[in-house]
């Protein structure tokens, strides 16, 4: 758990009493600033400083995130979003980073477990899995298998235990091998013959899409191309979130596998976000319609509304809940020990 490095600063206005401020310095890639909160004209005692720190911690941390978002958003080149929308996403990124840095190791495990349950239930439900959120939790956490569920659906949920372990331990770039390994784990015990293997047929149709997928002979070449395009764009300061959305769409249109493309594509998308300290996107059943609609914009080469819908999804899912959860951890004396899985608001 990271400490909040606040300090007290005193200003001496001419012909006026000294004024005291609680200050946090802000540094981001060579740029610096500071956030100040006035404490009045009386010198604060150690007890005062502790009380002010707890009282103003959330306000200061929020303003720090805003300042870093201002710095970072001006460093990117973006094609489909305006500056204000980019600042919103960047503010979310830095609030999320602050939140996770304030958690203890046990609290991070509880938070990530809660997110993973929501994520797995959502990403599989998009593909037709009928597990409820509680049933997914019972299976993933307690190993309780619900009655009357098909073996395929059970394996679809359980396979994400291996996916999470692999994803969390992997620290490299997205590669062909990484993509195949994800698919193998996602489809293990479901489709033995094709798990981890690119499709060999072109007789593939994407439901609700009139466009043709990549020819099977070109799958690896096309994937290599979009992987290289993604990392080249990031190196040239293209906006990460935009580029991750575009990669996700291109991946789905290549459709490299006979089945499981959506689950693999969403894993890669969130991996790209998480590598750059953005919170992951939940693909909840309730958001299925908006998610599918956004990809359909891409089919018409209307990438601006597609990217904006992804932005709206992550902001609507994560921002308000992140604010609530940050308030819970930013003031230590009100936490009452380690936070539990149930202490966090829904992801």
Could you tell me what each predicted segment is?
Residues 1-259, 263-347:
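FIC/Doc superfamily catalytic core
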